Amino acid sequence: DGLPAPYGHTYEGLVCKAGDWQYSTIYADPIAWIRSKHVDYLAPQLYWTNSHSTNPYGPMIDWYSIAAKRFGRHIFGALSITFLEEGNNTSNYDEVIRQVNQTRATTRDNFPGEMFYSSRSMFGPTCSGLDSYLKQKVYQYPASVPAMTWYNAPDLGKVTNVKLSGTTLSWTGKSNS
């Protein structure tokens, strides 16, 4: 594949700078999964901040963006926001904003967004206001579902005549769909 190893990860025998790599510890190979088209997307745990000494966020997001483009699958960065629990203030929130903006700038077509770990950090009492801050700064508009161009989706036509009867939902759609 010619992919260089990302910071914080090893691939095909390259040494990991920090943490561990699932290939050699739990025998999972997510790059093989997207290469072989067995999965539609990956959500790598990109749990480091931009200021991390050996595994800064930027080079990792760039590496996974290259992998997503090369293998034609989506990758959603799983960002940790648990560090916010140590200091609930907007200067710490700005690191999350930087990561979202880096993801958007590095997209290369197949990196359509991010997800956060953990919901306790997002909605818990320690980080009250984070969700509102993100809505104000980077999530002002609804997101569209990214196209999975590798599927040939049928044209299902417009749904009409939607009815709910008890627990049964029915509708009229294009015939033979």
Task: Tell me what each language-model feature is.
Residues D1-I26, G72-L84:
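Aromatic-lined carbohydrate-recognition surfaces of secreted/lumenal glycan-active proteins
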Residues D20-T54:
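Aromatic- and acid-rich polysaccharide-binding/catalytic face
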Residues L42-P44, I75-L79, P112-Y117:
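Hydrophobic faces of well-ordered beta-strands that scaffold small-molecule active sites
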Residues G2-P6, Y47-H52, I81-E85, S119-F123:
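Solvent-exposed loop/turn segments at secondary-structure junctions
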